[in-house]
Amino acid sequence: MKHFHLKVKEVIEETSDAVTISFWHPLSEMIKYQAGQFLTILLTIDSEKVRRSYSMSSSPHTDTAPAVTVKRVPGGLVSNWLIDHVKEGDFLEVLEPMGHFQVLPDARNVRTVVLIGAGSGITPLMSIAKSVLKVETESRVVLLYGNRAEEGIIFKKQLDEMSRAYGNRFNVYHSLTQPSNDWKGGLGRLDKSMIVATLEEIGGVKETTTEYFLCGPDGLMETTKEALLAWGVAEERIHRESFATATTHPVHEADEDDDSLKMQEIKVRYEGEEYTFNVAPHQTILEAALELDIDLPYSCQAGMCTACMGKCTSGKVLLDEEDGLTKSELAQGYILTCVAHPLTKGVVIEIE
């Protein structure tokens, strides 16, 4: 996995609690990425090594400088540090862009792309919108975007400018839960009825070529997915990205004679090396590796970003969280080490 030390080109204040950080490309090569992917930033804060993934708000098709947008999280170690300390000319260590939540625009496409998000969930959706509108000149983009108040709408000015520039090819629908008296947009939280009613009012978004991309709080994405499925949208056309961060993994139930309650020796093959180590009951494979200073790839530690994806070629594992993988990937034996527990003896994981 490639590491880069990127020089900060500019820090732009989007709202009172969100900034966009753009970077110069390294002299040796261009940073390559797809619309919707994320960048993982590696920092040392108060002697603690930390890493966080931030979706790229720039588009590889419209922006010369790669950029991420960071929203302040109350009590959040990394988001607060980045917003309070990073300035033009600083260098940040990052991993190469990653993530399956992406769009590969094709000039031959004629379709509708529906984007539904809230708060900082707009970040990858912005990248997707700019890319599709630029490359697919016959396609249309629809954005449903929920926020608390107008002053908290990230990219408000850019979205307005894009609406004017692209006309009926870019339809933006804002909804606020705490609007001002002069607000003329939508009111209330994006719920099932509002989402379906808005899409029906727009019209032309139910064709089999339409793709749906969701990003925001888990509750919103679950609600939206349920609404779309009930509305008749095929599940394979619904794509989602979560901004989850590491949490305590739930303990899975097991019988006393279940091997999952025993220390398991496993093997992990990565970058030409084979590591053999023990994983304690209720410990994830990644947690065990990091305790031994085995430098496996990872980012979110919540089973969503897929940076730690590997393939289980022997034995069985249990995943605390499966939403980060497709059904096809699960069927092929792919796992995420940050949420994976060995269930049997002889577990072997191969990481590309």
Residue ranges and their predicted role:
Residues 288-292, 307-352:
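Iron-sulfur (Fe-S) cluster-binding segments and ferredoxin-like electron-carrier domains
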